[in-house]
C-alpha cells in the first residue's frame, strides 16, 4: 500500500514547519537535503552496473531511454535534453519519455501514470530494440506506467534498470538492476519532488556522465565533443583546445577552423602535429578516445 512507503510517511523532524520563520524553514530543508548524497552513495555499485549496461548499448548503436511519470519523468527528460549540448551527441542517443507526453513536462497530468499499456505504446513509438537500455524512474517504485515500460523492455531483450526511493520496490523486482536510494519521509509529507527528486537527479547525472566518459566524449575533464553552435560555445571550444594543448587563443582559433569546428579533431591535430584527415583517422582507430591516439 502507498501509505506504508517510507516516502509517504510524515517526517517527525518537520511536524511544526508551518510555525517556523523563513530562515528556519530553509535550515530544516537544508538539513534534510544533506542526507541525500549518503543514500545515493550506498547505491554506487548498482549505479555502476547501470553505467556498464548503458555503455554497452551505446557501443551497439543502442540508446539510453529514461521513462517516468510526474517529477521523475521530467527529470529524465531534463537529463536527456542536456546530453546533446554537453557531449555533442544526437538527441536520439539519450531520450526521455514522460507519461502524458511532452505536454506533461510543464502541466501536471497525474492520471497518465496509471496506464501500463501507454508505456508500452510509447516505447513502440520510438521503436525500442534489444540494444537499448531502459531506465524506469519512480519515487514510490510502484508507478504502473513505469512497471509497464520495464516489463515490455524485458520482453524484447533490452537492458532494464529501476530507480526508486523505497527498498524492495515493485519496479526493482521487474528490472535487471535496482537502484533504490531510500530518502525517507519528505519535509512536506509525500512531496517526492524534494529529497526523492534530488536523489534521482544525482543518479541520472552519474549515469549519463559516466556513460559518456566511457565512450570517449571527455578528455581529461573537458567536454571535447562540444558543438560550437553559438558565440559562447565557440569561445568555450577555443578555451577547451587551449586547456588540452597549452596553445594560445589565436592558435586554438586557427585549429578549430581547420578542424571544421570539431574541438576533438583540433586537439588531436595539435597533439600529434597532423592534418585534419590524419586526426580523423587517429580518432577512428581510437574509437573516439583522444588518450588512445597518443
UniProtKB/Swiss-Prot annotation:
Question: Whose protein is this, by species?
Answer: Oceanobacillus iheyensis (strain DSM 14371 / CIP 107618 / JCM 11309 / KCTC 3954 / HTE831)
Annotated GO molecular function terms are: carbohydrate derivative binding; carbon-oxygen lyase activity; ether hydrolase activity
Q: Which UniProt keywords apply?
A: Carbohydrate metabolism, Lyase
Q: Show the active-site residues.
A: 82, 113
Q: Which family does it belong to?
A: Belongs to the GCKR-like family. MurNAc-6-P etherase subfamily.
HAMAP family given in the database record: MurQ
User: Which top EC class is named for this enzyme in its record?
Assistant: lyase
Give, as in the UniProt entry, the pathway in which the protein acts.
Amino-sugar metabolism; N-acetylmuramate degradation
* Keyword Magnesium among UniProt keywords: no
Q: Which domain of life is it from?
A: Bacteria
Q: What is its EC number?
A: 4.2.1.126
Function description: Specifically catalyzes the cleavage of the D-lactyl ether substituent of MurNAc 6-phosphate, producing GlcNAc 6-phosphate and D-lactate.
Q: How does it assemble?
A: Homodimer.
Domain SIS spans what residues?
Answer: 54-217
NCBIfam families, sorted: N-acetylmuramic acid 6-phosphate etherase, PRK05441.1, PRK12570.1
User: What InterPro entries does this protein's entry cite?
Assistant: Etherase_MurQ, Glucokinase_regulatory_CS, MURQ/GCKR, SIS_dom, SIS_dom_sf
Q: What is this protein called?
A: N-acetylmuramic acid 6-phosphate etherase
Note from the entry: A lyase-type mechanism (elimination/hydration) is suggested for the cleavage of the lactyl ether bond of MurNAc 6-phosphate, with the formation of an alpha,beta-unsaturated aldehyde intermediate with (E)-stereochemistry, followed by the syn addition of water to give product.
Amino acid at each position: 500500500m502507498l501509505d506504508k512507503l517510507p516516502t509517504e510517511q510524515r517526517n517527525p523532524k518537520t511536524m511544526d514547519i508551518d510555525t517556523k520563520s523563513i530562515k528556519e524553514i530553509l535550515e530544516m530543508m537544508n538539513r534534510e537535503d544533506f542526507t541525500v548524497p549518503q543514500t545515493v552513495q550506498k547505491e554506487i555499485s548498482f549505479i555502476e552496473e547501470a553505467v556498464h549496461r548503458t555503455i554497452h548499448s551505446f557501443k551497439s548503436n543502442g540508446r539510453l531511454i529514461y521513462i517516468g511519470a510526474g517529477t521523475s519523468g521530467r527529470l529524465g527528460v531534463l537529463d536527456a535534453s542536456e546530453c546533446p549540448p554537453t557531449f555533442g551527441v544526437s538527441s536520439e542517443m539519450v531520450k526521455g519519455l514522460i507519461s502524458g507526453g511532452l505536454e506533461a513536462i510543464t502541466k501536471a497530468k497525474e492520471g497518465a501514470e496509471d496506464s501500463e499499456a501507454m508505456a508500452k505504446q510509447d516505447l513502440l513509438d520510438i521503436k525500442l530494440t534489444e540494444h537499448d537500455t531502459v531506465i524506469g524512474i519512480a519515487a514510490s517504485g510502484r508507478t504502473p506506467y513505469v512497471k509497464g515500460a520495464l516489463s515490455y523492455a524485458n520482453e524484447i531483450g533490452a537492458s532494464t534498470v529501476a530507480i526508486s526511493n523505497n527498498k524492495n520496490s515493485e519496479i526493482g523486482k521487474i528490472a535487471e538492476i535496482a537502484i533504490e536510494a531510500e530518502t525517507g519521509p519528505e519535509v512536506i509529507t509525500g512531496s517526492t519532488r524534494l529529497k526523492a527528486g534530488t536523489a534521482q537527479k544525482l543518479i541520472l547525472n552519474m549515469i549519463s556522465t559516466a556513460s559518456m566518459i566511457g565512450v570517449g566524449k571527455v578528455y581529461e575533464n573537458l567536454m571535447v565533443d562540444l558543438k560550437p553552435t553559438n558565440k559562447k560555445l565557440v569561445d568555450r571550444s577555443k578555451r577547451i583546445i587551449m586547456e588540452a594543448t597549452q596553445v594560445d587563443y589565436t592558435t586554438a582559433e586557427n585549429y578549430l577552423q581547420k578542424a571544421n569546428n570539431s574541438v576533438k579533431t583540433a586537439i588531436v591535430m595539435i597533439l600529434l602535429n597532423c592534418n585534419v584527415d590524419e586526426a580523423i583517422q587517429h580518432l577512428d582507430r581510437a574509437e573516439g578516445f583522444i588518450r588512445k591516439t597518443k
